[in-house]
Amino acid sequence: MNKPTILRLIKYLSISFLSLVIAAIVLGGGVFFYYVSKAPSLSESKLVATTSSKIYDNKNQLIADLGSERRVNAQANDIPTDLVKAIVSIEDHRFFDHRGIDTIRILGAFLRNLQSNSLQGGSTLTQQLIKLTYFSTSTSDQTISRKAQEAWLAIQLEQKATKQEILTYYINKVYMSNGNYGMQTAAQNYYGKDLNNLSLPQLALLAGMPQAPNQYDPYSHPEAAQDRRNLVLSEMKNQGYISAEQYEKAVNTPITDGLQSLKSASNYPAYMDNYLKEVINQVEEETGYNLLTTGMDVYTNVDQEAQKHLWDIYNTDEYVAYPDDELQVASTIVDVSNGKVIAQLGARHQSSNVSFGINQAVETNRDWGSTMKPITDYAPALEYGVYDSTATIVHDEPYNYPGTNTPVYNWDRGYFGNITLQYALQQSRNVPAVETLNKVGLNRAKTFLNGLGIDYPSIHYSNAISSNTTESDKKYGASSEKMAAAYAAFANGGTYYKPMYIHKVVFSDGSEKEFSNVGTRAMKETTAYMMTDMMKTVLTYGTGRNAYLAWLPQAGKTGTSNYTDEEIENHIKTSQFVAPDELFAGYTRKYSMAVWTGYSNRLTPLVGNGLTVAAKVYRSMMTYLSEGSNPEDWNIPEGLYRNGEFVFKNGARSTWNSPAPQQPPSTESSSSSSDSSTSQSSSTTPSTNNSTTTNPNNNTQQSNTTPDQQNQNPQPAQP
């Protein structure tokens, strides 16, 4: 190829490339201006408005007006320089240099996202103010069009307002936890002073809170608040705003320095605090908007009368005789037909001066013990055809966790031999539960649990009798909220509904969003009925007799966790029956309720009558909910038949001598389901047909746990 030809080719390619670049710019510009043409108009009234959100109950009665009760705006001249330096250090280093957007920061965020395969923001302080005022804060709403509008409005605002005005808007707009809106409000209520009278470490604490105000609340989470404050101070030092000496003095100042006793910031009843916290979380999850900083009307599913009655059960001795004031209770009640949470409470004797604090009702940091057996072991076994009747014979005999030499123990260290499935569940025997999970297979059990809203990062055979998980994320494990929703699927015939606290949101522009909860099939109707039929006997003959009400058709399961031998030796030091957690999950045709009881300090044991509180709280609340309602029992569905006290799938044998149908083998289990079904003379006694049954009272090694407790052996290795 000669030189003129090469030059012509280079010229052609250059022109083509330049044309593509120009076309891309024109097209991109066109798309950008299309997006920004739909952006809301800037309004000073919105930037400074004291927005509030009204919350209503399920009868459309006003519960709370959040945002109206505490907001004291700071004037620009009263904002201390150290606060400005702290805010720009942690939020926007180049705030005084950019004009609304920071191209250097955007490029840096882009490169970090490429390197870490994650999403990190490049928003300036001005963009954050725009987001708080006009847009959703949800990550899922970070669309290109939204980002374009946000950037455009930030540029517009920078042209119309000074940097001082923008900072003032921001300082007065942000939520600062405990019902406080704006940093001046927080200064007065946390320290009893105005902003311009606070110390450097106090200002650094306030500057760091807006990104996660409840997480960095110095009253509820002092360690996290101190870490965040010290990060702000470190950034101030790195930016040259404070000296090394100032930094050292500030970081060594206790986080509690100057904090006064927290006063109640709420204009709503104390019994609503836990529920409202979940309303706030669900509104943001479903809409992307924080109702504490965005004005809206929220219609919830709470039954205020039921909520108040639950509060009374917790905080008086009229319904339950509590052993002391320190014993804690957390529970959730859902409507089984739609998943609506009608009541929820996370603690007894809650502090009236903390807003939206820890809600134990949704925490997964305690073990739900044997309440996991119905949903992890037995329901999957019936669903997948491992068992075909409630009279199926299971083995309560010496057994190791599959793939290990670690034995599974019952509470009494004894064995009942061959017993029916119904009796194994009724008496909460551990060995048949673990063996059943092995037959079902870990993967199938995990899939079944997922269908009920419960997940583990990985499932182990110990999860047959425990909800323990190595992850602290609330996504994993069990809580009263999750268990009430899971058990509701038994009550309604097999449909899982996500727990819902809200049913409608009306935004400030008049638009609304309704939330209709569409359920998903979690199990066959036959599975749900067979489980219900077995769990009825838990209340009549088994471990749940403290929840029994003769006039009310209901079903449920007890649960108890326990201490390790080391914990007993070093901390508990008693031969009594003790437990860190006692639980009950149960339901009627209308409501499902799950109850956790224990002490905030796990090493404070439940003893004596304390071990009966969970079932008694459940019984008291179900009495209130069901009295005068003409409660209905469950009807046996097609595909099942009853023989005496047991329920069988069509085609399953119901006598000792008739042939059993073939059971599909588990593809994951190390042992097949070769157990046959039979009837027993009574579900209230072990089978007398088994000559190897042992008397639990003849064992030389006694457990220090209650009759419903499972052993907590070290996590077994997977085979």
Curated annotation (Swiss-Prot):
NCBIfam families: PBP_1a_fam (TIGR02074), strep_PBP1A (NF038272)
Enzyme Commission number(s): 2.4.99.28, 3.4.16.4
Subcellular location: Secreted
Additional facts recorded: These strains are penicillin-sensitive.
Active site residues according to the UniProt entry: 91, 370
Stored InterPro entries: Beta-lactam/transpept-like (IPR012338), Glyco_trans_51 (IPR001264), Glycosyltr_51/Transpeptidase (IPR050396), Lysozyme-like_dom_sf (IPR023346), PBP_transglycosylase (IPR036950), PCN-bd_Tpept (IPR001460)
Keyword Hydrolase: yes
Region Disordered, annotated ranges: 652-719
Keywords of this entry: Antibiotic resistance, Carboxypeptidase, Cell shape, Cell wall biogenesis/degradation, Glycosyltransferase, Hydrolase, Multifunctional enzyme, Peptidoglycan synthesis, Protease, Secreted, Transferase
PANTHER family, alphabetized: BINDING PROTEIN TRANSPEPTIDASE, PUTATIVE-RELATED (PTHR32282), PENICILLIN-BINDING PROTEIN 1A (PTHR32282:SF29)
Result, substituting residue 533 to E: In strain: 45607
GO terms for cellular component: extracellular region; outer membrane-bounded periplasmic space
UniProt protein name: Penicillin-binding protein 1A
Recorded metabolic or biological pathway in which this protein acts: Cell wall biogenesis; peptidoglycan biosynthesis
Impact upon substituting residue 397 to K: In strain: 63915
